[in-house]
Design a protein with these regions (language model features):
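A short, well-structured catalytic beta-strand-centered motif of the EAL phosphodiesterase domain
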Residues: 14-49
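Surface-exposed amphipathic alpha-helices with a cationic face
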Residues: 107, 133-145, 190-197, 218
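A short, internal acetyl-CoA/4′-phosphopantetheine-binding micro-motif in the GNAT/acyltransferase core
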Residues: 50-55, 88, 174-177
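Residue-level signal for alpha-helix termini/capping positions
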Residues: 7, 52, 73, 107-110, ...
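Structural preference for beta-strand elements that scaffold enzyme active sites
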Residues: 10-12, 28-30, 80-84, 115-119, ...
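C-di-GMP signaling machinery
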Residues: 1-12, 50-57, 238-245
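Catalytic core of bacterial c-di-GMP phosphodiesterases, primarily the EAL and HD-GYP domains
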Residues: 58-131
């Protein structure tokens, strides 16, 4: 089924805002993939499972990234864009394109490399951290930024944070959900803030769904946030966030 969806160009991109918690302005957007509405493949989890089942992980990720960049360029957006890429596919992409090839590829979509943030997923499976660190250096040399996704979900590696030195780390929503009611989650976030200061990394709090959680994270000094309370994924990027946030 997924191979057919890819062939028939039935997949589309939606964009969710990432917000500056201090200023209440849009900092960036994350590109997310969706299947045809009203089908089993509308949800991204179903698409990811199908990619796994059909052994199409590489093709699926490349299509997702291409669609996101193509639409971003067509919209003439000047803001930053986060795209998800697994560590394994990132290694393959860089082996194929190299630093200069990557720059040309991004520009071919009408997007400047400095607008792009590669959000690395599934990095817990990395066998060769040194290789990934070298690739991270090449990506940065191309003008692209790096982010680690879902940090703290139990599989993430502090060593990888230290070696890759990503510009951004996204805190797993487990630590932000109902943070206003859990002192231990507050302490965990504060510990991550100390590590982020050492590595000069900006933090994004994922999964912000209530005003109370937003207030706590803002008071803690977390730079950026993402979640349904701030803005749901939509066909078009948001120009500004709603007054409730």
């Amino acid at each position: 089924p997924l191979a057919g969806l890819i062939r028939s160009k039935a997949l589309h991109t939606v964009y969710q805002p990432i917000v500056s918690l201090c200023g209440g302005t849009i900092y960036s957007h994350e590109a997310l993939i969706r299947g045809p509405q009203g089908t089993l493949f509308q949800a991204p989890d179903a698409l990811l499972a199908a990619a796994q089942d059909e052994n199409l992980n590489f093709e699926f990720e490349i299509v997702c990234i291409s669609l996101a960049l193509e639409r971003w360029g067509a919209l003439g957006e000047s803001g930053r864009l986060f795209v998800n890429i697994s560590a394994a596919v990132l290694v393959q992409v860089m082996a194929h394109y190299g630093r200069e090839g990557l720059t040309k590829l991004i520009r071919s979509f009408g997007v400047l490399p400095r607008m792009l943030v590669m959000e690395i997923t599934e990095y817990e499976r990395v066998a060769d951290m040194d290789q990934l660190a070298t690739i991270a250096h090449d990506i940065r040399s191309a003008g692209v930024s790096l982010a680690l996704d879902d940090f703290g979900d139990g599989r993430s590696s502090l060593r990888l944070w230290a070696q890759l030195r990503p510009e951004i780390v996204k805190i797993d929503k487990y630590f932000t959900k109902n943070i206003s009611q859990h002192a231990d989650k507050v302490k965990t976030i504060q510990s991550l803030q100390q590590i982020a200061a050492i590595f000069d990394t900006a933090l994004v709090a994922e999964g912000i769904e209530t005003e109370d959680d937003l207030r706590v994270l803002r008071d803690l000094g977390i730079a950026y946030g993402q979640g349904y309370f701030l803005g749901r994924p939509a066909q078009l990027p948001l120009a500004e966030i709603g007054s409730q946030a």
